[in-house]
């Protein structure tokens, strides 16, 4: 019996995860149809993707670029319908336009569309970690009510998902997320004070966008992933461990109460996790070769240095505080990373700004989206205001 074609929406289509998803989808035209493509501001790149993949719908987040998108589609003779803005995207992902959503919009900007997909009961391939960090309780509740199928696309959570063959943690003693350690593993604080944005974006094993690359360099990426794992798998902080594994071949480990430990290994390529999410519980080709253990003949593990890289500690603290603290952490980090990439602050000022926000703002119960968005806005305001009180980056 032939299975129906799955209609897939790729949100964040012009980013690195979007490109990986489209690569996998293009390999299986009889199984998948790209029904919707969405991007934030890169309208020319979105138009090029529309020309290649011929989606039914295209959405540009920046409403001022709607005319450019619409006219570009018309000039190319494409039948793709143009839309703009957050509300239009949320409405489309909740409609019959798609049954599968790749949520890869970076930052809090992806929250509304991710929640809309969860409420509508879609298969949600979740690469937008901020949705879980900012509103994890709400997202998981909506998915539970609607029957949405959440499959994490982060390599670490996808590895746990594969080891468990689901998100059920019966019999699990603990899970261990691995971290590459970023480009500055082994650096001390004196060395980190001189780091430039260009250096921070040079990740040793993964190809990622600027914001995620900096998060990896500060270990905030791993901190956010600890919070994600808490929501995805329902485990407390003490059952979520982190180890630095510079080869980035073992993506996570699951230790069971009987003494067994399962690990998932693969080359560091997001196409593997995307293929898992698109086809689960079956398997499809991703374009990623298998792992040659004779070529990679050693696997190293070490504890993360949370004194030097304090973002991981701050993330754990925020998770244990609960309520709106993770939302504060996330918003302050976004502002701090943006300022660092603009050369306005030094590398070590990123955790300092985050800690300032966490100690300044009160904790509330994270029981409504309105509360979370209000806290998000207020955190951004006070973090912006605090930028002038922190030292500028050191001259090279």
Curated annotation (Swiss-Prot):
Protein's UniProt keywords contain Protein transport: no
Pathway where this protein functions: Isoprenoid biosynthesis; isopentenyl diphosphate biosynthesis via DXP pathway; isopentenyl diphosphate from 1-deoxy-D-xylulose 5-phosphate: step 1/6
Enzyme class: oxidoreductase
Keyword Manganese: yes
GO biological process: isopentenyl diphosphate biosynthetic process, methylerythritol 4-phosphate pathway involved in terpenoid biosynthetic process
Database matches in InterPro entries: DXP_reductoisomerase, DXP_reductoisomerase_C, DXP_reductoisomerase_N, DXPR_C, DXPR_C_sf, NAD(P)-bd_dom_sf
Sorted UniProt keywords: Isoprene biosynthesis, Manganese, Metal-binding, NADP, Oxidoreductase
Cofactor dependency: Mg(2+); Mn(2+)
A GO term for molecular function: 1-deoxy-D-xylulose-5-phosphate reductoisomerase activity
EC number(s) on file: 1.1.1.267
Binding site for NADPH: 14-17, 40, 128, 130, 209
A Pfam family that the UniProt record links to this protein: DXP_redisom_C
Reactions performed catalytically: 2-C-methyl-D-erythritol 4-phosphate + NADP(+) = 1-deoxy-D-xylulose 5-phosphate + NADPH + H(+)
Residues holding 1-deoxy-D-xylulose 5-phosphate: 129, 155-156, 180, 203, 216, 221-222, 225
Binding site for Mn(2+): 154, 156, 225
Record-stated family: Belongs to the DXR family.
Protein function: Catalyzes the NADPH-dependent rearrangement and reduction of 1-deoxy-D-xylulose-5-phosphate (DXP) to 2-C-methyl-D-erythritol 4-phosphate (MEP).
Protein's UniProt name: 1-deoxy-D-xylulose 5-phosphate reductoisomerase
Gene designation: dxr
């Amino acid at each position: 019996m032939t299975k129906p074609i799955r209609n897939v929406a790729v949100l964040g289509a012009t980013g690195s995860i979007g490109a990986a998803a489209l690569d996998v989808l293009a390999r299986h035209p009889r199984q998948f149809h790209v029904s919707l493509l969405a991007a934030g501001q890169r309208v020319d790149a979105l138009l090029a993707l529309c020309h290649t993949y011929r989606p039914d719908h295209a959405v540009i987040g920046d409403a001022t670029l709607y005319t450019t998108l619409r006219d570009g589609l018309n000039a190319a003779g494409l039948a793709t319908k143009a839309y703009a803005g957050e509300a239009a995207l949320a409405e489309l992902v909740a409609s019959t336009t798609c049954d599968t959503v790749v949520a890869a919009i970076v930052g809090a900007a992806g929250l509304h569309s991710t929640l809309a997909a969860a409420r509508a009961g879609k298969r949600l391939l979740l690469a937008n970690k901020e949705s879980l960090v900012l509103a994890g309780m709400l997202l998981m509740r909506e998915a539970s009510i609607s029957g949405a199928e959440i499959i994490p696309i982060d390599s670490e959570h996808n590895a746990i998902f594969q080891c468990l063959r689901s998100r059920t943690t019966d019999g699990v003693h603990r899970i261990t997320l691995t971290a590459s350690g970023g480009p500055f593993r082994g650096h001390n604080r004196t060395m980190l004070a001189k780091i430039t944005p260009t250096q921070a974006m040079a990740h040793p094993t993964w190809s990622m966008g600027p914001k995620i690359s900096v998060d990896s360099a500060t270990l905030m990426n791993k901190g956010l992933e600890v919070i994600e794992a808490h929501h995805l798998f329902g485990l407390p902080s003490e059952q979520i461990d982190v180890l630095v594994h510079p080869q980035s071949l073992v993506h996570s480990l699951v230790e069971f109460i009987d003494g067994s430990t399962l690990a998932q290994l693969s080359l560091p390529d997001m196409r593997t996790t995307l293929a898992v999410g698109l086809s689960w519980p079956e398997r499809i080709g991703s374009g990623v070769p298998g792992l040659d253990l004779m070529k990679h003949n050693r696997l190293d593990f070490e504890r993360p240095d949370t004194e030097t890289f304090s973002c991981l500690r701050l993330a754990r603290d925020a998770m244990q505080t609960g309520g709106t603290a993770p939302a504060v952490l996330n918003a302050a980090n976004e502002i701090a990373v943006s300022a660092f990439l603009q050369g306005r602050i030094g590398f070590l000022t990123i955790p300092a700004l985050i800690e300032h926000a966490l100690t300044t703002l009160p904790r509330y119960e994270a029981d409504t989206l309105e509360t979370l968005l209000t806290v998000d806005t207020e955190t951004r305001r006070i973090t912006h205001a605090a930028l002038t009180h922190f030292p500028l980056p050191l001259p090279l």
